[in-house]
Amino acid sequence: MTSTSPRAFGVRSMTAPLRRAVLRIPAAVGDFEGAGWRPPDARLLLSQHERLAGLLEALGVEVIVLPPLGGLPDACFVYDPVLVTGAGAVVLRSAKQVRSGEAEPLAAELEALGVPVAGRLTGEARADGGDMLWLDERTLLAGRGYRTNAEAHRQLAAILAREDATLERCDLPHDRGPAHLLHLMSVVSPVADDLAVVFEPLAPVPLLEELRARDVRWIAVDPEEYATLACNVLAVRPGVAIMADGNPRTRRALEAQGCEVHVYQASELSKGDGGPTCLTRPIHRSG
């Protein structure tokens, strides 16, 4: 698509209209087992990713598709290596060793797209973007678990303070342990200012209390559909969302709340346990 503001950037919302987003073509070859994937069909994996990009474009998003990154299977999950704020990209440091080479290349690609580096985690700080979501334009909620540590919280709070934003902390459960993925956004996806989807059995109590305090209603995802990523829903704009196909109960519940729901075929993309929010790095939301 052609953008009217080709270098526009800034994200301080999970549901404001998505103007620009980055996706990365999945690696067709690589150590999928070492990265924790179930073996995908490479041809279908690439086709499904292309169709997801096309769906976003059809919904009015300017999509920039980046090339595969050095045979790294997880590199297609572009939400995790950086956090985009109102000031630019904060370069994160992954606690998953096989993802340690993703952040700096993505930061350089974003700079070429007009998104400046607003900060970098250093030293012992470790964090994934999947542990972070904007509660409002001045408040970032960050999970504390096996992927994001307390030192990252400390450094992120200092970076956010430079743009008059604050960080709230939320401890995550052990679930199945450090070898298995559990991000904050594994258990919650905002869909509109007053609506989210939540997997209650793993949702931290402070998260639910925060949603209630903000008058946010939520749809409770059941365990069967949680396993097929029904809790991973990307808001394109308030009440318009993208989710993986094969989750009819959650889809119907969203539609009953007045949402417009679009689905994509995800049989291969989901083999790395990532949904549309993981596969999409918003770089500009506004309106």
Feature locations, PLM:
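The feature marks the mature, well-folded catalytic cores of soluble enzymes
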Residues: 2-287
